Amino acid sequence: MQLNIPTWLTLFRIALIPFFVLAFYLPFTWAPMVCAIIFIVAAATDWFDGFLARLWKQTTRFGAFLDPVADKIMVAAALVLVSEHYHTWWITLPAATMIAREIIISSLREWMAELGKRSSVAVSWMGKVKTTAQMAALIALLWRPNFEFELGGFILLYVATVMTFWSMFQYINAAWSDLREA
């Protein structure tokens, strides 16, 4: 297996996860900002690795596998941290919903791939919009420099939660005939 720059960016994103987790727990007033900045860099590599892979025609099966895995680990870690910080059901419930959706859709994609129908549950524009809202919410809720920023994060978290359900139902609907035959 040959590693190209887009795949190295994905590996770099995975390597950043422990650093934003550690930054979250630092006992300094600037720790939330550092945590959010590391998360921003990791989130930027999510966009940049795919862009470069397509631009340079360096898409690989390994990269196609690793990229969504890196995304899910990064987002799940951030959701757990945000849930721990706020320690309330109205943050934990959307976080648990998003993590559950990622597990369900990843499993659905794997199953559809075994049937040779992975393209029917390929990433949709709704999934991309959900991810954008999710990333923005997590940045705001990890950083939380002021009330307005935090409030925006809460609102985006709930927007992302609604989109989480919407996109999940889109994927399930796309696979429904195969699910009924199973």
Curated annotation (Swiss-Prot):
Membrane topology: Multi-pass membrane protein
GO cellular component terms, semicolon-separated: plasma membrane
Cell compartments where the protein resides: Cell inner membrane
GO biological process, one term: phosphatidylglycerol biosynthetic process
Reaction equation(s) it catalyzes: a CDP-1,2-diacyl-sn-glycerol + sn-glycerol 3-phosphate = a 1,2-diacyl-sn-glycero-3-phospho-(1'-sn-glycero-3'-phosphate) + CMP + H(+)
Enzyme Commission code(s) on record: 2.7.8.5
Parts of the chain on the Cytoplasmic side: 1-12, 82-86, 169-181
Keywords assigned by UniProt, alphabetized: Cell inner membrane, Cell membrane, Lipid biosynthesis, Lipid metabolism, Membrane, Phospholipid biosynthesis, Phospholipid metabolism, Transferase, Transmembrane, Transmembrane helix
Periplasmic side: 38-60, 108-145
Pathway(s) per entry: Phospholipid metabolism; phosphatidylglycerol biosynthesis; phosphatidylglycerol from CDP-diacylglycerol: step 1/2
Keyword Transferase: yes
GO MF annotation, one: CDP-diacylglycerol-glycerol-3-phosphate 3-phosphatidyltransferase activity
InterPro entries with a match to the protein in the record: CDP-alcohol_PTase-I (IPR050324), CDP-OH_P_trans (IPR000462), CDP-OH_PTrfase_TM_dom (IPR043130), CDP_ALCOHOL_P_TRANSF_CS (IPR048254), PGP_synthase_bac (IPR023762), Phosphatidylglycerol_P_synth (IPR004570)
Membrane-crossing segments per the record: 13-37, 61-81, 87-107, 146-168
Family matches, as NCBIfam families: pgsA (TIGR00560), PRK10832.1 (NF008090)
Homology family: Belongs to the CDP-alcohol phosphatidyltransferase class-I family.
The protein, known as: CDP-diacylglycerol--glycerol-3-phosphate 3-phosphatidyltransferase
Organism encoding this protein: Photorhabdus laumondii subsp. laumondii (strain DSM 15139 / CIP 105565 / TT01) (Photorhabdus luminescens subsp. laumondii)
Lineage: Bacteria, Pseudomonadati, Pseudomonadota, Gammaproteobacteria, Enterobacterales
